[in-house]
Curated annotation (Swiss-Prot):
Identification of the protein by name: Electron transfer flavoprotein subunit beta
Species of origin: Homo sapiens
InterPro entries: ET-Flavoprotein_bsu_CS, ETF_a/b_N, ETF_b, ETF_beta_N, Rossmann-like_a/b/a_fold
PTM sites of type N6-succinyllysine: K210, K248
Modified residues (Phosphoserine): S223, S226
Effect of L195A: Severely impaired in complex formation with ACADM
Localization per record: Mitochondrion matrix
Modification N6,N6,N6-trimethyllysine, positions: K200, K203
UniProt-listed PANTHER family: ELECTRON TRANSFER FLAVOPROTEIN BETA-SUBUNIT, ELECTRON TRANSFER FLAVOPROTEIN SUBUNIT BETA
Length: 255
């Protein structure tokens, strides 16, 4: 069996099926009493790590999440999918709401060094903020090569071949390990955790640490000025002829 070790980042986000509501004070979105789940792109990253282990190319898969106590539920999901153990970097809820890609990348970089992993896998972006920055920043802090938007990953000895979709075709990268890879939707289809694996996950270890244990300051240099609901779409108007359409467009100043 290979001795490679993989760190997979998993983020707890508001479930994609939930209708987002803005807080009355417009400082963010309502999270209390709202269903949360693992970020879909993170699920893909976990699945890829587990598949590498099933092929006996990886020795250990470690799932990590940064946030409030409820993040342990997200880690348990990763453990049920096949990750070996979890690390919860506990952050108070109020502070967790202000976490950005820069702070999370600092945490991931420190953990990658501490755990001596060979590969950091994470989703290309999270569906709550769509930043698409954490993987790139993590690679920057570690000074590791990176393969973003991966649609196929192949381990070749001490190198990783990454295919990524770009405008007009495919780009193939060959990265020397250790490396950072971010997962695209086309990389794989995540499995559903079976009941036996869900039960086994309850017995797997989750280590709880603080950002300070890693020497990381989570103070953000960004502040949210205001969060607004998207403007309501105005009702459409049915027109019978091309002439009516042109007249209507002139009326509203579009032509």
């Amino acid at each position: 069996m290979a001795e490679l070790r993989v760190l997979v980042a998993v983020k707890r986000v508001i479930d994609y099926a939930v209708k987002i509501r803005v807080k009355p004070d417009r400082t963010g979105v309502v999270t209390d009493g709202v269903k949360h789940s693992m970020n879909p792109f993170c699920e893909i990253a976990v699945e890829e790590a587990v598949r590498l282990k099933e092929k006996k190319l990886v020795k250990e898969v470690i799932a990590v999440s940064c946030g409030p106590a409820q993040c342990q539920e997200t880690i348990r999901t990763a453990l049920a999918m096949g990750a070996d153990r979890g690390i919860h970097v506990e952050v108070p809820p109020a502070e967790a709401e202000r976490l950005g890609p820069l702070q999370v990348a600092r945490v991931l970089a420190k953990l990658a060094e501490k755990e001596k992993v060979d590969l950091v896998l994470l989703g290309k972006q999270a569906i709550d903020d769509d930043c698409n920055q954490t993987g790139q920043m993590t690679a920057g802090f570690l000074d590791w090569p990176q393969g973003t938007f991966a649609s196929q990953v192949t381990l070749e000895g001490d190198k990783l071949k990454v295919e990524r979709e770009i405008d007009g075709g495919l780009e193939t990268l060959r990265l020397k390990l250790p490396a950072v890879v971010t997962a695209d939707l086309r990389l794989n289809e995540p499995r559903y955790a079976t009941l036996p694996n869900i039960m086994k996950a309850k017995k797997k270890k989750i280590e709880v640490i603080k950002p300070g244990d890693l020497g990381v300051d989570l103070t953000s240099k960004l502040s949210v000025i205001s969060v607004e609901d998207p403007p309501q779409r105005t009702a459409g108007v049915k027109v019978e002829t091309t002439e009516d359409l042109v007249a209507k467009l002139k009326e509203i100043g579009r032509i």
